């Protein structure tokens, strides 16, 4: 079942950890593409110097962060790679969780074509399908078109994985500093990256 609106409310760090093991789903041209979330990063603007919304900075790009939890915040890095975030916290509190890595589940042929334009992949290429924020967006067909979309929609949502199928029994959740935020002064050291230790699709050990 889809995660209800209440799933995204509450402390952003707790929501980030709850997202691990759940399934990110995007329906593209009627075909379901999905993956199990294995790595995330929490961003707690306006006090977090690593957040786009640090200091309450409000722009056309970040406006969705100030809205209701349970919406998609998508942005571009380096002018070419999309990053997908889940908005958390109450209206007016611009916080969110970046989805950093997935284990592919549904629509794997479409995911392969989206990433490599072929379906016969090496083991290394397969592991690289969704082990990074830009890679998973390309794989699932997530673009700026999805910015601001409610995660209650039929085409883009988080699917809750039943306890008996949840991979949390196989992997330990580890916390550590977030990646590629050297500009963020003391926030560089916040242990707000959460991932399944030892999972093959985690982007960085």
From Swiss-Prot:
Gene3D superfamilies for the chain: Methylpurine-DNA glycosylase (MPG)
Pfam families: Pur_DNA_glyco
Gene Ontology BP annotations: base-excision repair
GO MF term list: alkylbase DNA N-glycosylase activity; DNA binding
Keyword Amino-acid biosynthesis: no
EC numbers on record: 3.2.2.-
UniProt cross-references to InterPro entries, sorted A to Z: Formyl_transferase-like_C_sf, MPG, MPG_sf
Keyword terms, alphabetized: DNA damage, DNA repair, Hydrolase
HAMAP family according to UniProt: 3MGH
NCBIfam families attached to this UniProt entry: 3mg (TIGR00567), PRK00802.1-1 (NF002001), PRK00802.1-3 (NF002003)
Protein family: Belongs to the DNA glycosylase MPG family.
Database matches in PANTHER family: DNA-3-METHYLADENINE GLYCOSYLASE
Identification of the protein by name: Putative 3-methyladenine DNA glycosylase
Source organism per UniProt: Bacillus cereus (strain 03BB102)
């Amino acid at each position: 079942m889809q995660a209800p609106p209440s799933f995204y409310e509450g402390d952003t760090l707790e929501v980030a950890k709850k997202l691990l093991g759940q399934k990110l789903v995007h329906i593209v041209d009627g075909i379901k593409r999905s993956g199990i979330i294995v790595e995330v990063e929490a961003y707690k603007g306006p006090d977090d110097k690593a957040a786009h919304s640090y200091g309450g900075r409000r722009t056309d790009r970040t406006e969705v962060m100030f809205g209701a939890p349970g919406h998609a915040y998508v942005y571009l890095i380096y002018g070419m790679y999309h990053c997908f975030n889940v908005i958390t916290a109450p209206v007016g509190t611009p916080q969110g969780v970046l989805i950093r890595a997935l284990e592919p589940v549904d629509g794997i042929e479409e995911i392969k074509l989206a990433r490599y334009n072929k379906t016969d992949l090496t083991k290394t290429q397969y592991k690289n399908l969704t082990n990074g924020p830009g890679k998973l967006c390309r794989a699932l067909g997530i673009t700026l078109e999805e910015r601001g979309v409610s995660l209650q929609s039929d085409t883009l949502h988080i699917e809750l994985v039943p306890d008996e199928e949840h991979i949390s029994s196989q992997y330990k959740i580890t916390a550590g500093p977030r990646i590629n935020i050297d500009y963020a002064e003391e926030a560089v050291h916040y242990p707000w990256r959460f991932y399944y230790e030892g999972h093959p699709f985690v982007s960085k050990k």
